[in-house]
Regions:
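Aromatic- and glycine-rich beta-strand/loop motifs that create alpha-glucan
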Residues: 1-21, 25
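Junction motif at the cytosolic side of a transmembrane helix
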Residues: 8-11, 291-294, 361-382
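Membrane-helix interface segments
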Residues: 17, 210-211, 297-302
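Residue-level recognition of transmembrane alpha-helices
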Residues: 22-25, 218, 305
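Secretory targeting signals
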Residues: 28-81, 116, 120-195, 216-294, ...
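Transmembrane helix segments
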Residues: 35-36, 295-331
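Transmembrane helix boundary and interhelical loop/hinge segments in multi-pass membrane proteins
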Residues: 188-203, 207, 211
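Juxtamembrane non-transmembrane "cap" segments at the membrane-aqueous interface
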Residues: 244-252, 317-340
């Protein structure tokens, strides 16, 4: 088995198109990092200067409570940007500005300038409770999330400091999934059609080792390539983000990035998405190989995968009703592995426990991976 696995893995890695595609996708990530530093924004500041000001300002505010004093510190910087067009000071407290905009659902200067501590917390609680009620499909889920809102706001929020690196990585996970699926559609679509094209099917079917061992070796090789490239993508993202934005702020509350009562830090949220991404890479790898086995055509397999990918990119949301449609839609890796896809208000009750979507879906992916492997093996035997 080990010998067959190594042979199939070597054969897969010898494809030039695999290295070309993977290299281009990794280069895209590196170019994203370079663009973040070099581009000039509407404020007239270069990206690297904005990051520096953001980091310095975040460090100065780290550990402070989000209260009237912080709002009073923020207001002069915002007024200077609005009335004088100078955004340098605002960059130091941009996290607070963006947080206010999300809570108030506006970018209007008059409303942001008028906000005080009481208004901010009232609007925040109202928004969190309304979103929880709207996103919950059952009374049990609504009750669960309302209790989470109460826990989150039981004491004033504390700004943990600069956390742009982790926030950027969490926001980019949908793009990362797009790159991964694109790679898999090229790298694995020819795994089984190659045997038919090269007229080696008969050799496989009559192998003294049996078809089970041969196809298991192929599946493991494809899985290694898919998950391995996923790890390489994550390592590149982590490296580029660390160089450009830095990796401080792991423990900052995720509420400053995603208005949802998760009770988790932005670093924890990002690691959850990393795990979901790898589980999605595994199930998509197996799905690509099953499709190539069924169609016996690499172009058809690639077309199906890319078609689904483009569909989920063009259609950003589906109605919550019927519920089954919404659940299946967000089960697709290109929809689930993102802040908005993974962190939703759906709950699954198991043995008295309330499990969230980001706890359940990666497990479902791993189960689907096993089922797809069995399905591919059954197709091969047939």
């Amino acid at each position: 088995m080990a010998e067959l696995y190594r042979f199939e893995l070597k054969k897969c890695l010898q494809q030039k198109v695999l290295w070309i595609t993977g290299g281009i996708l990794l280069l895209c990530l590196c170019l994203w990092g370079a663009a973040a530093c070099l581009q000039t924004t509407d404020s007239g500041l270069r990206g690297e200067e904005i990051i520096r000001l953001h980091r310095e300002g975040g460090a100065a505010l780290a550990g402070e409570t989000v209260d009237q004093d912080m709002l009073d510190q923020f207001r002069p910087a915002y007024e200077k940007m609005v009335f004088a067009g100078d955004a340098r000071e605002l960059m130091g407290c941009i996290d607070i500005y963006e947080f206010l905009g999300h809570v108030l659902d506006t970018a209007a200067s008059a409303e942001i300038l008028a906000v005080d501590q009481q208004m901010l917390y009232d609007r925040l609680e109202d928004k969190l409770r309304t979103e929880a009620e709207k996103g919950s499909a059952t009374e049990q889920a609504a009750s669960y999330w309302q209790s989470k809102v109460q826990q989150q706001l039981s004491q004033p929020l504390v700004y943990g400091g600069y956390h742009e690196g982790w926030s950027q990585m969490a926001s980019l996970m949908k793009v990362m999934t797009f790159l991964e699926v694109l790679f898999l559609s090229v790298a694995l679509s020819g795994m089984f059609p190659q045997e038919a094209q090269h007229r080696t099917d008969q050799l496989i079917l009559s192998s003294r080792r049996g078809r089970t061992a041969l196809y298991t070796g192929k599946l493991l090789a494809g899985l290694t390539v898919g998950v391995g490239f996923g790890l390489l993508l994550l390592a590149t993202l982590l490296g580029v983000t660390g160089l450009v934005y830095g990796l401080e702020g792991f423990g900052v509350s995720a509420l400053f990035t995603l208005l949802m009562p998760l009770g988790a830090s932005i670093g924890q949220v990002t690691l959850i998405l990393f795990g979901a991404f790898l589980a999605a890479a595994a199930v998509t790898s197996l799905a690509a190989m099953v499709l190539s086995q069924v169609t016996r055509n690499s172009v058809a397999t690639m077309g199906i995968l890319v078609g689904i990918l483009l569909l989920t990119t063009l259609i950003t949301a589906v109605p919550e009703s019927p519920r089954l449609l919404s659940v299946l839609w967000y089960l697709l890796p290109s929809n689930f592995v993102s802040l908005q896809g993974a962190f939703r208000y759906d709950l699954l009750s198991v043995g008295g426990l309330s499990l969230t979507t980001w706890q359940v879906t990666p497990v479902v992916y791993l189960l689907l991976t096993a089922l797809l492997a069995l399905g591919d093996w059954h197709i091969a035997r047939g």
